[in-house]
């Protein structure tokens, strides 16, 4: 193996060097801006995490699994996962092996930055080594991924995607230059190995690299470096606190524009809502288009399905809530009319909080009370005759300060009751209690978990019916709080159960969500019908859910019975 030229330089390396210098400079500046936008405590927390051994290891593992192998996409669609991982992992291995090749065979050139990229032009005989054969194998892997990407542009359904994003001008330039890089590299290397030292293919290869790197910071491919930064932020325990800065900015930059969230979004039962998916929210956040950010943020139902399917984990609901919170309001409630009384006394008892929506569907509260009596539980019903809201509607509307005031007042009442357990029947309230309340010494539990515990202790005597139910996973209970199994265990004890085609994490929102500020009833009805059609696919006799909002929404449109799980448990149990 010998060098072909006395000097290890040719002008065709200049575009590559210019592109690399540009992308490194811009990305470092963008990263510095993001870090500076963090508050002082978060910035210190992040810096300390970078020297913590366990977090360093976790960062490395997560970057490999999420940025190179794309494990989440593999779980969603194997062909889609292979396409992304073959390009990302294959390119990474080409870079790694290229540097290893220089280190082994011409270590004196290791400091020449571009040498591993154009190795076959400067070195003769390099194709006969084992490392060269590995490089060829990974290049073929990348070319296979590029071929699939071209097919996906034509036939996205093959990859499990009915809809894809509309590419911007910058994204198209980045896409086509990325597609050109690897065929041009293959052509240039084959020419050099055949003894043809024509520089035309090397110029084309270098220019395509330069084009991709120049476009990268301004389009979808910014997600490549941004996602790595996001992983370190997330593993440091940082959360989104500002609507367009810091963690919010890096989440928006990390969106790969893959479009998986478009099919997942339940609002897209109406095609008019396609442009309001999270992928377009992040695009408008990057552009600084405040008007479109407001429109997209207000329409969303905050069901969380986009976050569930996102390969990066972009928190669409949180980004929208903070965008809503950035607005100024003229009315500032203080809840002074709530009084200062001690509230319900439930010392060492179960304190049942039914919530506003259960007040509108009283059969749920009565069923919960009946089951508690059958099991012999000592309880008090906190808001039997009315009470304060949990605060979640204010929180999702972006009224964070007002919601916090309501939370503090409720905390006083609940802690002052002396209760040992706070039992909640509304998953909307349950999530707010779990995430935002400080109730020392009080266990917060949803009735599905609590009833399951009573069943396991032998305090509930079930009689099984011959009705077959399909369970609708409420957004807040399932994706919001991770409760999927206990409702199904209760149903299977009381009756037979069937599953809808899309269930658990993939469950479709009922359409009645309190999260949307602007979605009208006509468009909500389409979402509800789509959710019901999914449930009808189970061929079950009746529908059961564990959310008063889902119950009231489905009951208006369903052609078969709809019940809350508390009703089923009450109907199918008798006193011990």
Predicted stretch roles:
Residues 180, 184-188, 192-196, 231, ...:
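Iron-sulfur cluster-binding electron-transfer modules in prokaryotic oxidoreductases
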Residues 236-259, 277-302, 530:
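Ferredoxin-like iron-sulfur electron-transfer modules
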Residues 1-246, 262:
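Membrane-embedded alpha-helical bundles of multi-pass integral membrane proteins
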Residues 302-304, 308:
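EF-hand and EF-hand-like Ca2+-sensor regions
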Residues 22, 29, 42-46, 222-238, ...:
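Primarily the internal scaffold of c-type cytochrome electron-transfer domains
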Residues 75-82, 268, 298, 335:
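Short coil/turn segments at secondary-structure boundaries
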Residues 213-216, 257, 264-265, 308-311:
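Conserved catalytic-core segments centered on acid/base and nucleophilic motifs
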């Amino acid at each position: 193996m010998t060098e072909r030229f006395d000097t290890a330089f040719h002008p065709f390396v200049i575009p590559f060097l210019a592109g690399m210098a540009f992308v490194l400079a811009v990305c470092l500046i963008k990263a510095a801006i993001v870090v500076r936008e963090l508050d002082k405590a978060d910035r210190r927390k992040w810096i300390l995490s970078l020297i913590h051994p366990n977090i360093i290891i976790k960062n490395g593992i997560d970057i490999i699994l999420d940025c190179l192998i794309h494990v989440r996409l593999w779980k969603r669609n194997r062909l889609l996962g292979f396409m992304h991982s073959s390009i990302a992992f294959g390119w990474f291995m080409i870079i790694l092996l290229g540097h290893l090749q220089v280190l082994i065979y011409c270590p004196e050139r290791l400091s020449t930055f571009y040498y591993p990229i154009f190795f076959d032009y400067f070195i003769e005989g390099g194709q006969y080594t084992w490392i060269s054969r590995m490089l060829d194998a990974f290049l073929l892997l990348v070319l296979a991924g590029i071929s699939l990407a071209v097919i996906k542009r034509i036939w996205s359904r093959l990859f499990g995607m009915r809809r894809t994003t509309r590419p911007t001008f910058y994204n198209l330039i980045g896409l086509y230059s990325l597609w050109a890089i690897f065929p041009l590299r293959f052509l240039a290397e084959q020419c050099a190995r055949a003894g043809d030292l024509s520089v035309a293919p090397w110029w084309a290869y270098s220019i395509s690299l330069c084009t991709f790197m120049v476009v990268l910071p301004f389009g979808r491919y910014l997600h490549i470096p941004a996602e790595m930064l996001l992983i370190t932020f997330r593993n440091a325990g940082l959360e989104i606190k500002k609507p367009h800065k810091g963690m919010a900015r890096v989440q928006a930059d990390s969106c790969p524009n893959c479009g998986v969230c478009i099919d997942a979004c339940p609002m897209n039962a109406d095609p008019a809502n396609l442009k309001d998916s999270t992928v377009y929210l992040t695009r408008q956040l990057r552009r600084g288009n405040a008007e479109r950010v407001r429109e997209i943020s207000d329409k969303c139902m905050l069901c969380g399905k986009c976050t569930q399917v996102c390969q990066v984990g972009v928190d669409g609901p949180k980004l929208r809530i903070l965008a809503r919170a950035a607005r100024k309001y003229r009315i500032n409630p203080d809840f002074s009319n709530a009084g200062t009384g001690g509230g319900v006394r439930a010392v060492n008892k179960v304190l049942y909080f039914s919530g506003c929506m259960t007040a509108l569907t009283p059969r749920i509260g009565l069923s919960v009370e009946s089951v508690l009596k059958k099991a012999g539980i000592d309880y008090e019903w906190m808001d039997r005759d009315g009470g304060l809201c949990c605060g979640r509607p204010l929180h999702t509307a972006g009224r964070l300060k007002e919601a916090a005031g309501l939370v503090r007042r409720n905390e006083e009442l609940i802690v002052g009751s002396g209760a040992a357990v706070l039992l909640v029947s509304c998953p909307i309230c349950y999530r707010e209690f779990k995430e935002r309340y400080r109730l020392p010494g009080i266990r917060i539990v949803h009735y599905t978990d609590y009833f399951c515990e009573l069943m396991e202790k032998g305090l509930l005597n079930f009689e099984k019916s011959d009705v077959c139910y399909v369970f609708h996973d409420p957004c807040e209970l399932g994706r919001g709080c991770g409760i999927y199994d206990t409702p199904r265990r209760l149903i299977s004890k009381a009756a037979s159960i069937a599953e809808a085609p899309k269930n658990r994490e993939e469950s479709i929102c009922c359409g009645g969500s309190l999260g949307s500020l602007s979605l009208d009833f006509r468009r909500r009805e389409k979402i509800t019908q789509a959710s019901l059609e999914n449930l009808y696919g189970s061929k079950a006799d009746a529908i059961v859910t564990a959310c008063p909002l889902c119950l009231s929404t489905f009951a208006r449109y369903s052609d078969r019975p709809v019940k809350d799980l508390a009703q089923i448990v009450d109907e199918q149990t008798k006193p011990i």
